[in-house]
Amino acid sequence: MTIPRAPARIAVLGAGLSGLTAAYRLSSALPGARIHLLDGARQGGWVKSDKHRVSFVSSGGERLEGEITCEAGPRSIRPRGGPGAPAMLKLIRDAGLEPAIVPIPTSHPAARNRYLLTPGGLERVAPTPIALLKPSSASAALFRAVAAEPFRRPPAPYPADESVASFFTRRFGARVAHIASAFVHGIYAADPAQLSLRSAFGILHDAEKRYGSVVLGMLRGVATPEAKAAERAAWAELGGLGKKREGWSMYALRGGMGALTARLGAAAAANGVDVRCGPEGRVTALQRTGDGVEISLPSGPLEVDHVVSALPPRRLAQLAPLPNLTANPSTTVGVVNVVYPLPPGAIHPDGFGYLIPRDDASRDAALGVVFDSTALPGTGDGLLEGKLTKLTVMMGGPYWGAYGGTAPSSPDALVAPALAHLQRTFPALRDTEPLLVTPHLNAECIPTYAPGHGARLRETHEAIARDWAGRLSVVGAGYGGVSVNDCVLGAELVAAGLGRGEAVTGLERWSTWE
């Protein structure tokens, strides 16, 4: 469906990564349009890269001083795994940040060494199928379950959706479902029993549905020829950069993820976008008018032709009467950055970090720990790299909700349990005072897609198309994926569609969901 003309006045609500991407791309696609970027809080959303000055005496007696970067939100990016990966890398290139890319090759310890924390200590997660043959309780359980999976019959009739916990228990058994809870904690900070398999790990649903077995489906592939061709074309468009990323396991940005949101905000403003963040950018109401939308702001009404909402669905529900916006819960995640005056090798094994299955060694509601110093070297510690240790403790999520607990009212309450967790896990820290501890309480930051999410998005798409008639689009983690790649892709698609004069809801992918 097309609209009579591309909108000349556009408001983007929300200045996180999705909203910034939408505003930046719209300012290029529609250079004659008047674009407003509105957010009642800070620019950047959940992306937050903090700089800290530290000074300490090393174990060798050397006085060291310098600036380090700590992340309160996302910190690494995957260079594969769907159409969002090339979209993100293209955005970084177009924003002029290609020189800031810090690639982590597939041979790097951070790519090969990832751990689970079990009651018996840290267990390395097998990075390859062959490694499953090596002795460890987790690998042995996975190997036996994978070997038996092709012989399990799929249910009839096949479910349209189910929880992640139900699926893993049914296909691989309770032990593997328990191990899988750690990965759900790391990605969604959610209870696997509440999370939609089809929306969170759709490739597993498709593999079993098509081939009767997840293992056989993964071996044969489930992507359509059209999807494969589109992804190849997207990578080819990136030329040499698209080729180089084939050797990367992941990548980060020098200076942190905040370098990207800052650059997008500055570029959008330079392109003429009216950026209002803080109290002046808080939207209190949306009202459809004859051929546009009236937005209520503290300074008065703002008339636009089109609204792109990058707000969380529950926040949008306060402004627009649309179905299903409050159907999914969101989890609150505590993030505690801790810096010690010891080299990483004196504290933890080389690698990315560890995740914790439900209830395993999690008396302090810990979900996992990132070994920032070895996971993402070269991203912002300068001459101090290798001489101090940065760790990030992730806490809460389902432990402050589905598992029965409640979130603390202040981020300061996270410090004691985070330090206690680290001291139990790494004995070297029991007699070492940290240089820096910075707690963050990210309230309702990650949506939990409840089973049936895709069908509900189809209904929401239909309602937006019918009731808003080309005047509203939605983007962000609340709809089509929680990763930074997913967020960028959704914003890119909406901006491109509006630039072509199309009426886009942002939910076209779910229009044929069954």
Task: Please give the residue ranges for each predicted region.
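Glycine-rich FAD pyrophosphate-binding loop
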Residues: 27-61
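Active-site/ligand-binding neighborhood in enzyme catalytic cores
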Residues: 148-284
